Every structure is written in structure tokens, then in C-alpha cells.
């Protein structure tokens, strides 16, 4: 049924001053006051009892709305007229409806068991400052939530698996203890014996360690520390760990099951052959007219020809360290008191000019093998010096 809402009348516009006129114009088919028992239209007070206002005969035909419902219906009808006319609705008409909806929602939806509030799609937190970590049932964490977070420090990273151990603990567990390094050092020693590069030579770890096996323990501490800082190799740690603190020459335990006497005889034989083929290697150092200050130039190794460190055999590149501690101590004392010989670029290039040195080669006890190893990196002249001394001693 259409209602006569043709236009806004002054009475409707001024509904706050005259609510009776607005009600009459909006709802002409409804009475503003309830009917009396006799039907004469006499209104009774609001404080009158229900039986006095509505007799049993008229109680069967009660009006469809109460007084409060009439007021709300009038307000909604007025808002509807504003919407139809295209006029903005005054805020004082909207606020009562909003308050009514808030009270209605608080009455039906704000139950403590449900926890839902009006105009909210998710559950409200009854304790905002508490950690929201739960087990899905009744338990909840009692700690305070961290700033800018819904959880405490413990439950902030709940997605990670906390049963795993920290990374630092795993690294310590995976690292080998010092005792296992000694047991597994035999394999690197055997692998180093087959290499042709001087970087895998066992002389360097022996020099780097002050108490290491081989010739390193017979050298002065200052010389050993100086060479140890220069000749440090990546694979020198297992050798130093094996040889440190012991007096045994461990280099000969990784080359096979031959006895030490057989290996000494083989080294001396090859050293004698090398000294015969290359007599220019055996210059006496005490007759050298060049002091230490004359070493202003360090020539390249191209003058060596075929006698380069890479062309030397494996046996020639091994240092000679089985003559004893007394013999090496004498050599170390001689080394400090002697001057260095000229380098390769200052020597004669041909073998004819070496004929005058034949007599000097016979007197081989006047120079030490340790000094010769300074100019020849592979220390092949150590074997020549040692074999010559043993020959003169016989």
C-alpha cells in the first residue's frame, strides 16, 4: 500500500518541534493514542494497568505496534522520505538507529562464550596484552605478548621446528677431535709421497713445526720460524700434528716397509751419481769472494737448464735427516759463520771453465749441506755433501 509521500511538508521538516503533526502526516491511518474500552477514544494514562486499558473483550484485538515501536517506525519513515527526495539524512536521525543496533547486537551477539562484537568478523581478544598461543582447547599462554606482536618471545616463531639443535652445536659435533687427526694422517702422507710438486714435500711441515719430525728439529729456532711463515702450505697441518712432540722421523713410515739402512744406502748412491754428473753444484762456500751484500740480483731459474726442481726425482727432493743430532748441530753452527756464495747468473755457463775446481771438489768437508740448500730449493746438494763426507771419513 503506497503512502502519500509526495513532498516534504513544513510540519515534516520541523518534526522535532511538533512530533504529533509529523506523525499525523506520515501515518494518517494509525491512531496516535490507543482506543478506550468504550470505543470513545478516551486516552488513559500510561500508568494505568493493562486490565483497565484493555478489557478482556478488546484484548483480543490489540494494536500491531507499541508506543516505542510507533516512534521507531515514524523515524524510519522520515529517513525514507529523505532518501526518496535525494536530501542528505540528518545525523540526529541516524544516531538513534545506530545506538539501537549496538544495543541489540550487544544483547544477542556479545555473549562471553562467543566473544563476537558488533561489526567485527573475527573473534575479539578478551585479554589484549596476553599471548594468544593456545592448544586449541582451554589452555592459553599466560605470558605477556611482545611489542607489536600477538605472541610472547617463546611462541613468536611457532612455525619453526624447535626440536632441532642449534647450528653451532652441529658444527662442533661434526668437527673432528685432535686425536682423530693423528689416526687419519697416514693417508695424506702416502698421497704426498706420490706427488711431483714441491708443495707436497714433507720438508715444509717439518720446518714449520718447531718440534716436528725430520730436519726441522735439527735447525735453529729462528731459522725454523722464519721459514715456517714463508713455506706454510695448506696440507702442512696433518704433518705438523703427527710429528709434533715426538722425536721419530715419520717421513719414512709412509714410503713402504723397507728398512732405514737400505734407504740410506740408496740415497747415498744416488747422491754420489748426482755429484759426478753435476760437479758445478759442489762449490766450496768458504772460498767465495762474494759477501752477503753482493746478492742484489736474484736471477731466474732458467739458467738451470734441465736441473729444475720439477725435474728432480722424488728421492732427491727428500731432505737428509738421518745422520744424527750432533752432526746437524755442527752444520747449524757453521751456517751462522759463513757467507753466501754467488747465485747462478754469476757462475760460468760452460763446463770447460770448471776444470780448475776439480781439486776443490776433493775437499768437501769444508762446507755444509744446510747452506747449499738456501740456493737450491730442492736440497739435492744435501745428499752430495753427506755422501762426500762419508767417503772422506772412510
UniProtKB/Swiss-Prot annotation:
Motif Bipartite nuclear localization signal, chain ranges: 130-140, 158-165
Coiled-coil ranges from the UniProt annotation: none
A Pfam family per the record: WRC
Chief place of localization: nucleus
Keywords of this entry: Activator, Nucleus, Transcription, Transcription regulation
Limits of the WRC domain: 125-169
InterPro entries: Gln-Leu-Gln_QLQ (IPR014978), GRF (IPR031137), WRC_dom (IPR014977)
Domain QLQ: 64-99
Subcellular location(s) of the protein: Nucleus
GO-annotated biological processes: cell population proliferation; DNA-templated transcription; leaf development; positive regulation of DNA-templated transcription; seed development
Biased composition (Low complexity): 170-180
Tissue expression remark: Expressed in stems. Expressed in panicles.
Effect of residue 163 to K: Increased grain length, width and weight
GO molecular function, one term: ATP binding
Induction per the UniProt record: The microRNA396c negatively regulates GRF4 at the transcriptional level.
Subunit structure: Interacts with GIF1. Interacts with GSK2.
UniProt function note: Transcription activator that plays a role in the regulation of meristematic function in leaves, stems and inflorescences. Transcription activator that plays a regulatory role in grain development. Positively regulates grain size by promoting cell division and expansion, leading to increased grain length and width. Positively regulates the expression of genes promoting cell proliferation. Activates the expression of expansin genes to promote cell expansion and grain size. May promote grain size by activating brassinosteroid responses.
Miscellaneous comment in the UniProt entry for this protein: Plants over-expressing GRF4 exhibit increased grain length, width and weight. Plants silencing GRF4 exhibit dwarfism, delayed growth and inflorescence formation.
Domain notes: The QLQ domain and WRC domain may be involved in protein-protein interaction and DNA-binding, respectively. The C-terminal region downstream of the QLQ and WRC domains is necessary for transactivation activity.
Record family assignment: Belongs to the GRF family.
Protein name: Growth-regulating factor 4
Taxonomic source organism: Oryza sativa subsp. japonica (Rice)
Amino acid at each position: 500500500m503506497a503512502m502519500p509521500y509526495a513532498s516534504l511538508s513544513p510540519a515534516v521538516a520541523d518534526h522535532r518541534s511538533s512530533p504529533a503533526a509529523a506523525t499525523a502526516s506520515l501515518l494518517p491511518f494509525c491512531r496516535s493514542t490507543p482506543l478506550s474500552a468504550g470505543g470513545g477514544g478516551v486516552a488513559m494514562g500510561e500508568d494505568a494497568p493493562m486490565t483497565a486499558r484493555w478489557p478482556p473483550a478488546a484484548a483480543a484485538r490489540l494494536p500491531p505496534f507499541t508506543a516505542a515501536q510507533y516512534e521507531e517506525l515514524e523515524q524510519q519513515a522520515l529517513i525514507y522520505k529523505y532518501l526518496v527526495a535525494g536530501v542528505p539524512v540528518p545525523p540526529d536521525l541516524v544516531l538513534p538507529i545506530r545506538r539501537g543496533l549496538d544495543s541489540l547486537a550487544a544483547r544477542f551477539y556479545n555473549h562471553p562464550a562467543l566473544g563476537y562484537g558488533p561489526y567485527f568478523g573475527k573473534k575479539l581478544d578478551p585479554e589484549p596484552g596476553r599471548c594468544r598461543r593456545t592448544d586449541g582447547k582451554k589452555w592459553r599462554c599466560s605470558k605477556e605478548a611482545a611489542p607489536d606482536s600477538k605472541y610472547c618471545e617463546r611462541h613468536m616463531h611457532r612455525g619453526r621446528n624447535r626440536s632441532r639443535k642449534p647450528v653451532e652445536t652441529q658444527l662442533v659435533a661434526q668437527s673432528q677431535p685432535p686425536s682423530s687427526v693423528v689416526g687419519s694422517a697416514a693417508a695424506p702422507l702416502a698421497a704426498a709421497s706420490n706427488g711431483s710438486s714441491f708443495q707436497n714435500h714433507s720438508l715444509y711441515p717439518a720446518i714449520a713445526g718447531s718440534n716436528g719430525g725430520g730436519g726441522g728439529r735439527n735447525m735453529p729456532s729462528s731459522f725454523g720460524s722464519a721459514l715456517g711463515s714463508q713455506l706454510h702450505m695448506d696440507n702442512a697441518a696433518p704433518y705438523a700434528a703427527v710429528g709434533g712432540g715426538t722425536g721419530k722421523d715419520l717421513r719414512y713410515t709412509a714410503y713402504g716397509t723397507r728398512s732405514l739402512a737400505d734407504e740410506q744406502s740408496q740415497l747415498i748412491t744416488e747422491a754420489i751419481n748426482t755429484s759426478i754428473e753435476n760437479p758445478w753444484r759442489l762449490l766450496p762456500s768458504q772460498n767465495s769472494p762474494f759477501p752477503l751484500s753482493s746478492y742484489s740480483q736474484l736471477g731466474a731459474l732458467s739458467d738451470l737448464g734441465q736441473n729444475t726442481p720439477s725435474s728432480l726425482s722424488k728421492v732427491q727432493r727428500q731432505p737428509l735427516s738421518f745422520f744424527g743430532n750432533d752432526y746437524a748441530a755442527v752444520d747449524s753452527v757453521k751456517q751462522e759463520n759463513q757467507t753466501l756464495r754467488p747465485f747462478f747468473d754469476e757462475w760460468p755457463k760452460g763446463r770447460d771453465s770448471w776444470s780448475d775446481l776439480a781439486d776443490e771438489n776433493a775437499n768437501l768437508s769444508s762446507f755444509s749441506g744446510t747452506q747449499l740448500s738456501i740456493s737450491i730449493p730442492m736440497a739435492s746438494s744435501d745428499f752430495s755433501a753427506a755422501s762426500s763426507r762419508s767417503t772422506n771419513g772412510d
